[in-house]
Design a protein with these regions (language model features):
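A detector for small-residue-rich transmembrane helices and their helix-helix packing motifs
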Residues: 1-185
Length: 185
């Protein structure tokens, strides 16, 4: 089925989508440094989206999941390499579908969660408070980690250097991260 869509819409696929995602992070960091108030208007907040600030459906992608540090820079370089490899392996269209559907499902899931929690906690919290609370947890962290897990599933025998010294097969990093996700839930 995806092959039919690929033949029809493959010409619209964005090459180097990972690079654009990382460039978005850089733009987001620059905005946060120059104008923190404007950066606050870019974040995801279901309450504000449902009250007219619809740009937040898209601009939350510019917000970084972590604060800027040397580890963030290393992470971005790693995700660029993993994303480029997945794009070459799967093809541009399928990689686009993978990332964009992850972004769309994140937005849909957050809005559904907001609506459900608004009804459940309507007497305890204001809908604006719930929107801010949910918005604080919506980031591209899980999108980035899904790139990592997809790479681990596609290339389980590849090695990463832990602390730039110890070679470990990426499948074990994937297993550890999968266990972390299950414990975190």
């Amino acid at each position: 089925m995806i092959s039919n869509f690929e033949r029809k819409y493959g010409k619209y696929a964005v090459k180097n989508l990972t690079l654009y995602l990382i460039a978005g992070y850089v733009i987001g960091y620059m905005v946060s440094l120059v104008n923190p108030t404007l950066y606050g208007l870019l974040t995801f907040n279901p309450y504000m989206i449902l009250h007219g600030q619809i740009w937040r459906i898209v601009t939350w992608v510019l917000t970084m999941p972590e604060e800027l540090s040397i580890f963030t820079i290393i992470m971005l370089i790693l995700y660029y390499q993993l994303g480029q490899t997945l794009e070459r392996t799967w093809g541009t269209y399928r990689y686009n579908v993978y990332l964009i559907s992850g972004l769309i499902f994140t937005v849909v899931g957050a809005i559904v969660l907001y609506v459900v929690l608004t009804f459940v906690y309507k007497d305890t919290f204001s809908s604006q408070t719930l929107g801010s609370y949910i918005g604080a947890y919506v980031s591209t962290y899980y999108i980035n980690m899904s790139i990592f897990l997809a790479f681990a599933a596609t290339y389980p025998e590849e090695q990463l250097m832990l602390y730039f010294i110890i070679p470990i097969k990426i499948k074990w990093f994937g297993v550890l991260y999968g266990a972390y996700i299950l414990i975190d839930i």
